[in-house]
Amino acid sequence: MQVIVALAALGSLAAPALGFSIPRGVPVSQSMIDVKLSSTGNSMVKATITNNGNRALNLLKFHTIMDSNPTRKVSIESEDGKEIQFTGMMPTYKEKDLKPSYFIFLPPKGTVEHSFDIARTHDLSRGGKFTLKAEGMVPIAEENGTEITGAAKYHSNELHMTIDGEKAASVENAFGIVKRGPLTRINKRTSIDMQSCGNNQELQALTAALKASAQLSSMSAQAVSQNQDKYMEYFKDPQYMQTVQSRFQAVAQESSSTTGGGTTYHCSDTMGGCEEGVLAYTLPSQNEVFNCPIYYSDLPPLSNECHAQDQATTTLHELTHNPAVQEPFCEDNGYGYERATALSAEKAVQNADSYALFANGKLNLITLMLIDPD
């Protein structure tokens, strides 16, 4: 299936821009990219990405079919139409200062292939017939550049596979069962794995981020019904107001619960998921959240810039990925302000960054800084 590619000049951003943000008003060109899925083994899948256009493209790998991390690249349904549980990671990437190594260069008419084993991130031990498909959006930079100037939406073909369950079960899962140290409920909120906190500074930063996440989420829940223009900017359709409000309330509860939360939060990476560029990640199948070193070194506790990344809203973002907070848990359908606000209402209400960006809006930031300047 073909993909619509959007390109724009570098200086044409009409709103605060992040590394993954897609400029507003971007002109839509002809279909230029093709994504095809094929089976190359029992549970092995090959994605073939072809540039059908006449200009070279630099494609960002993060949160796409080309991501080298064990992220959700395809949706998988069994023969009876049930979705197969995803057991991989949902990372939050740093959106600024993107490196050339984060991109794949695709010359005109060029093709790149990316293979992955779906048994590493899904339980396929029952075996049988499955249907796979992939869809998403690839941020694009100009040739030899790293500043995002456009995006390509993609919808792959449907791939039908018959999988041997015993062989699939023999594939090592990308993440085993998380081993925790002693757990402590700081102010009776989400459990913090104390053994993962290498120093007191990390624990203090995480505790402060959870406090800010609770406050921002609580204020956002109120803003959903009090500021309809702001709500519509991010979530598009009034019919989802109650869903959005209840999710913010659930995140606020999880961040500062008086009855005990359902997630475990780790100050540091104990599962090996902190690859380059990852700020934090969640294992939704286990309700576990992990911070990475650059969460502490590269993010402020709370940004005074609207729609910028910080520790508080990164933590809020991660908590929306956990089914113990609210089901169905949020996906990564659109990253950054421009991509998030371009989603359909159905996609936005299930998009983690839509909640983080809404909470990080100017009104909430000013209010939080006034009531909690420290």
UniProtKB/Swiss-Prot annotation:
Active site: 318
Organism: Trichophyton verrucosum (strain HKI 0517)
Task of the protein: Probable secreted metalloprotease that shows high activities on basic nuclear substrates such as histone and protamine. May be involved in virulence.
Prosegment residue ranges: 20-189
Subcellular location: Secreted
Family affiliation: Belongs to the peptidase M35 family.
CDD domains: M35_deuterolysin_like
Descriptive protein name: Probable neutral protease 2 homolog TRV_05367
Disulfide bond annotation, renumbered to this chain: 197-267, 274-292
Predominant localisation class: secreted
